[in-house]
Amino acid sequence: MKSSKRKICQVLALVVSGMGASLAMAAGPVIQGGGSSLVAPTIGSVSNPASEIGLFGTSEGTFTYYSVGSGAGQNAFLNNQPTFFGAGVTGTVHFANSDAALTTAQVTAYNNTGLGTTNGPLIQIPYIVTAITVPVVNAPAVTSSTTPQTTPGQAHSIALNDDDLCGIFSGKLTNWNQVINPETKTAYTTNAAPIKVVYRSDGSGTTELLTRHLAAVCTTANTASGVKFTDSLTFANTTAFPSGVPANFVAASGSAGVRGSLASLSSAGTAAVAYLSPDYTNTFLASQSSVVTSSGALQLPIASLYNTKDTKYYAPTYANATKAIGTITAPSGAAAGDPTQWVPVSGSAYAALANPASGYPVSGTSQIILSQCYSNAAAGAAVHDFLNNHYTNASYASVVHGNGFDTVPSGFQTAISSNFLSNSSNNFLDINDSSVCGAGGFAGR
């Protein structure tokens, strides 16, 4: 009997010891971020070892990412208001991800009169390079022998040009018998095949990247009457659609919502067109995305796009997205301290991104937004080390590529490391720099 009791006590001691070890391993601060649904599968969670948070583990801090859309992510960070992540979320907003860049007005307001006056300057830097794909569900059969592959088990693809994109997304073209094949210069079909258009109803950086291109290439000739696209996080805004969206348009919230709507329309045999990041499409474009690799996951067929400037057809691969962003360089010197210089929102660089000279036409970067100063030194260190891994660790790059994205160009990686992950640039922009944060000035968030 005594022996049994002794064994029970030993087992309990081992259990308690194990619990203590687990708690010690996860003893770091809670780090909260959120926003872009585009990067959500890449950033992931502790429970997914094939994601960035899964790779990072919990020894320095426990990261949680909330996929709520770029607009909500921006608002959460700028106001340090975690309820933008969800009604029951409390605590500090340490970072946000947004496919749409912050405007000059947003940055100025934050740094001059907003939380930046106590939290310290915000940092906005490119996180990944992405294409925005155009899924085409129940589209006419692919007859081309030259367009690039975009979909598993399908050697070629439906091709669309700017006139097609402007027509479909404005409501001018509502049937596949109106959509002109760029290769043959004839309609894709003579049969009636009405098209549903699925768009994001929430504040979406994916929408912003699409509308940036549409605003650059759509004209009164290729767009529905009264529709004028603007670069916006809101697709169905009153400037673009003063009379509301057409009857064939279907609203969906978040990338998962768009994919869900497409799945329903696919099952119903209804033709549909939408826009999504690669990680919500198929395994040809995103071979490791948790969204598309599960057993029986729908593999969405994707269009290739015709670049009118170099007259080539491109699949929305990460290599073609990087080709599209071209030779844009990272800011240096005093310009490095301006968050709007890291992601162009105006000028020639912006125009080059909106309608690129080569590569996949609807491409850009998704950004991470964070504070230079954190009041909790351990939180600041965890954020710093997570970012350092993202930009320099090959395992993290593999996760990025596996989700259909590219890492930022090497010149940006070097500039980010020398300005924000160290002070080798001597610009004093690095996270929790002692001359700027804490005793140096800003208390931090």
Regions flagged by a language model, labelled:
Residues 1-25:
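Gram-negative bacterial Sec-dependent N-terminal signal peptides
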Residues 26-445:
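Flexible loop/hinge segments at secondary-structure junctions
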